[in-house]
Amino acid sequence: IQIVDAQNRPMFDLAGTLLKDYATALLLEVGKYLNTVPNRITISGHTDETPFTGRRPNYTNWELSADRANAARRALIDGGLAYDKIARVIGMSSYVLLDKANPRNPVNRRISVIVMTKAAEDALLRTDTPSDAPSNTPSNRPIETTPAR
C-alpha cells in the first residue's frame, strides 16, 4: 500500500516528522482496515533527496525517515491496528523515490505500508533470528565487560 494523497500533497513538511492532519486521518482509517486482514505489515518511511540540515548533528535522512515510519506506526495503532500486526518499522531515506524524475518532489516524503504474505513474514522472521547465525559471530558471542573502578 503506497499511501499518497490524491492531490499529491506530502505527508510531512520538509524535514518534519509530524504527520499532516489529512495524513493522520487517512492512517487512522487504514489502521481499522488492516486489522481485518490476517497478515502482518511492515512500515517504511521515506524522504526526498533534500539533505537534512537541522541543528541536530549526525541526524540525517536515515533518522528522519525512520522517525516518519514510527509516526505512521503510532497513527495506525491509534486507528485501531493491533500492535502485534506490525512486523517491522524501517527508514529508507531517499533510496526508494516515488518521483524518480524529480527527487526533491515533496510527494517523495511519504510512508509505505506492505501487507506481507505468510511466506514473506516467515522469511523475515528467519533472517532476524539470532540463532540462525553461526555461534562465533559477534551477535552471539558473550559480551565481556570490565567493572568500573
Question: Where do the language-model regions lie?
Answer:
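Loop/turn elements at helix/coil->beta-strand transitions in domains of secreted/extracellular proteins
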Residues: 37-41, 85
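Hydrophobic alpha/beta scaffold of the E2-like acyltransferase core of 2-oxoacid dehydrogenase complexes
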Residues: 1-3, 9
